[in-house]
Design a protein with these regions (language model features):
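Short aromatic/basic micro-patch
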Residues: 4, 27, 100
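Conserved AMP-binding A3 loop
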Residues: 11-37
Length: 172
């Protein structure tokens, strides 16, 4: 039996601290959810074979709409992080193809990767990190070293990440 769903009525009530830090309820309608999903799908291709790792709490608006409802709408697999402290372990364990993250998490991952690359880079190239940005330095390294770095970074992300979806805050 088909059930009529009003596109403008509240569909889900999510609690968030938003930008003020004080908890409040956010009412999302069917239209709100569908607009978010359709807009995202206009930019990225989510496949049934995709696996994602849910890192943020499900009551987080961004997590609920993009990493839960969107992925379920495409028939994708959702895995769940044991805790924020175990995200790195869970990424290698579940080998996600898509990571839906907030900028703070991406910055944390970036910092960890950059530090590891700097520490393990051959001595003769370490001075480049002092002179150039991380991206510029990587571009100046020999192709074989760039490939080795890329392979290790990909492996640290479970070996299958093809897409990061970043949102819910400014990315600088």
């Amino acid at each position: 039996q088909q059930i009529e769903i009003s596109k403008d009525e509240m569909n889900v009530l999510i609690f968030t601290s938003g930008t003020t830090g004080s908890a409040k309820g956010v009412c999302l309608s069917q239209n709100n959810l569908l607009a978010d999903i359709q807009y995202t799908l206009s930019m990225v291709n989510i496949k049934k074979s995709d696996v994602t790792l849910s890192i943020l709490p499900l009551h987080h608006t961004y997590e609920c709409t993009l990493n839960c409802i969107l992925m379920l709408s495409r028939g994708s697999c959702i895995t769940y992080a044991d805790s924020l402290l175990k995200v790195t372990k869970n990424i290698t364990e579940y080998s996600p193809s898509i990571l839906v993250v907030v900028p703070a998490l991406l910055k944390m991952m970036d910092k960890k990767i950059c530090q590891s690359v700097k520490e393990k880079c051959p001595v003769k190239y370490k001075h480049l990190f002092e002179k150039y940005t991380f991206a510029e330095t990587i571009g100046k390294l020999p192709k074989l070293i760039r490939w080795a770095i890329s392979s290790k970074v990909q492996a640290s992300l479970g070996g299958k990440v093809r897409l990061f979806i970043v949102g819910a805050a400014d990315l600088d």
